[in-house]
Amino acid sequence: MRYYPRRRSLVKYVIGLLVSLLAHVEVIDLDNVPLQGGFLVTTNHVSLLDPILVFIIIPRKDVTALVAKKHQKNPLFRWVVDSVSGIWLNREEPDAHAIRAARELLQNGGVLGISPEGTRSHNGSLIPPKTGAAYLAEIAHVPVIPVAITGTHNGILRAFTLQRPHITVRFGKPFTLPPVDRRKRDADLVCNTDEIMCRIAAMLPATYHGVYAEHPRLNELLRAEEKS
């Protein structure tokens, strides 16, 4: 993986400036983000803006993300992703190279952003996720930080109508997933994925809960939050 410090700084500055001009971004509980050490940042995904927000908000120089290879077709987008050392991922089949690069980044103390849902939700509510995030947390032995983002659904379009959308980015506390038992690996990865998604959902409005609306773990987290 190649690093381009100057290009990264330029990209972060320009994108940060554009976002501040086009939208009002409210950041909540950023102090939950460690200033050192590797961890996985997991977000809900309703817009291409979601991973960009994570990149410009977290105050570290080693933040990057997994990005679908289909976006390589856009020369400008490819240049931006390469500038921030993004990891290109083939979502159509197992991508051993991307997984290895992601694990090395995390084990070397870097920060990796990923959307467990794997693709954008068209209506803003949570959709069935994939187990990739839970798998990465398992093989890299790093904690997970859930992030809930609201306001980006159609937010870019509203921005260009001179209506600055209100975007909220809320960072949850880091947590560690339980080890995966090899004898029931698939089931454990699903359970760990549900844990990630329920922690994200617990920070989202009810209208965003989607497929997790009736999940027992989400209800448990919401009750605990009410008591605190």
Which positions does each model-derived feature cover?
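Non-catalytic C-terminal accessory region of glycerolipid acyltransferases
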Residues: 1-7, 97-228
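Short gly/ser/thr-rich secondary-structure transition/capping motifs
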Residues: 20-28, 150-153
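Generic beta-structure capping elements
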Residues: 30, 44, 68, 92, ...
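Conserved beta-strand scaffold positions in the cores of enzyme catalytic domains, especially
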Residues: 27, 65, 86-88, 144, ...
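Short hydrophobic helices that act as membrane-entry/anchoring signals
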Residues: 4-23, 78, 82
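A general structural signal for well-ordered alpha-helical segments in protein cores
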Residues: 11, 15, 51, 64, ...
